[in-house]
């Protein structure tokens, strides 16, 4: 059961997820809306395609730090792994479906990565290893990245997280795979 403090934290996490690094950076540096450029997605990949590697890195880091901040604060305040995973889901939902941008946000991968590192760095390191293996096989980022993300529930089980926490990780994976389906 979620108490009122946790509920407010989830709402705040969702709203914090609404802060889109790509949008802020392009408005500040170029006075344009990234959603009108390239693929129209306000995420790191589109920033890299439109403006170059430096913008990719800045956007990736901004969105990853956003996820890490939310999960780190929740870890300090609440300590419950199931609530931490719920918090990660909330910040990702805020990034993908931001109310401030009429539900048109990024694809959630950078925010997921940052939040996952804050959640459990050992799981993150395990998934980095999985990514490297699949990267060497496929020689690209998209397929290895999505396969790696799909391995999260298995890692949750291997690292002895509760079934509820693991189910929440599955919901996050389904959401990210759905948003990245094209």
Curated annotation (Swiss-Prot):
This protein's pathway: Lipid metabolism; phospholipid metabolism
Domain of life: Bacteria
Pfam families from the UniProt entry: G3P_acyltransf
A single Gene Ontology CC term: plasma membrane
Chemical reaction(s) catalysed: an acyl phosphate + sn-glycerol 3-phosphate = a 1-acyl-sn-glycero-3-phosphate + phosphate
Known EC number: 2.3.1.275
GO MF entries: acyl-phosphate glycerol-3-phosphate acyltransferase activity
The keyword Transmembrane is annotated on this UniProt entry: yes
Membrane topology: Multi-pass membrane protein
Places the protein is found: Cell membrane
Signal peptide: none
Gene Ontology terms describing biological process: phospholipid biosynthetic process
Regions crossing the membrane: 5-25, 54-74, 81-101, 117-137, 157-177
Alphabetic keyword roster: Cell membrane, Lipid biosynthesis, Lipid metabolism, Membrane, Phospholipid biosynthesis, Phospholipid metabolism, Transferase, Transmembrane, Transmembrane helix
Oligomeric and partner information: Probably interacts with PlsX.
Role: Catalyzes the transfer of an acyl group from acyl-phosphate (acyl-PO(4)) to glycerol-3-phosphate (G3P) to form lysophosphatidic acid (LPA). This enzyme utilizes acyl-phosphate as fatty acyl donor, but not acyl-CoA or acyl-ACP.
Protein family according to the UniProt entry: Belongs to the PlsY family.
PANTHER family for the chain: GLYCEROL-3-PHOSPHATE ACYLTRANSFERASE-RELATED, INNER MEMBRANE PROTEIN YGIH
The protein's name in its UniProt record: Glycerol-3-phosphate acyltransferase 1
Gene name of the encoded protein: plsY1
């Amino acid at each position: 059961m979620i108490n009122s403090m946790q509920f407010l934290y989830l709402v705040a996490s969702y709203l914090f997820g609404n802060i889109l690094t790509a949008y802020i950076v392009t408005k500040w540096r170029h006075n344009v809306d990234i959603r009108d450029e390239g693929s129209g997605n306000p995420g790191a990949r589109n920033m890299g395609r439109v403006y170059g590697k430096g913008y990719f890195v800045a956007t990736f880091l901004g969105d990853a730090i956003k996820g890490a901040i939310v999960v780190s604060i929740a870890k300090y305040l609440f300590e419950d792994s199931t609530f931490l995973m719920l918090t990660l889901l909330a910040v990702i939902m805020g990034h993908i479906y931001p109310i401030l941008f009429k539900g048109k946000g990024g694809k959630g991968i950078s925010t997921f990565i940052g939040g996952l590192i804050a959640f459990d760095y050992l799981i993150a390191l395990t998934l980095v290893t999985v990514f490297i293996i699949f990267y060497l096989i496929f020689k690209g980022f998209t397929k290895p990245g999505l396969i790696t993300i799909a391995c999260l529930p298995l890692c949750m089980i291997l690292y002895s997280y509760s079934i509820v926490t693991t189910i929440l990780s599955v919901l996050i994976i389904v959401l990210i795979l759905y948003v990245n389906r094209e």
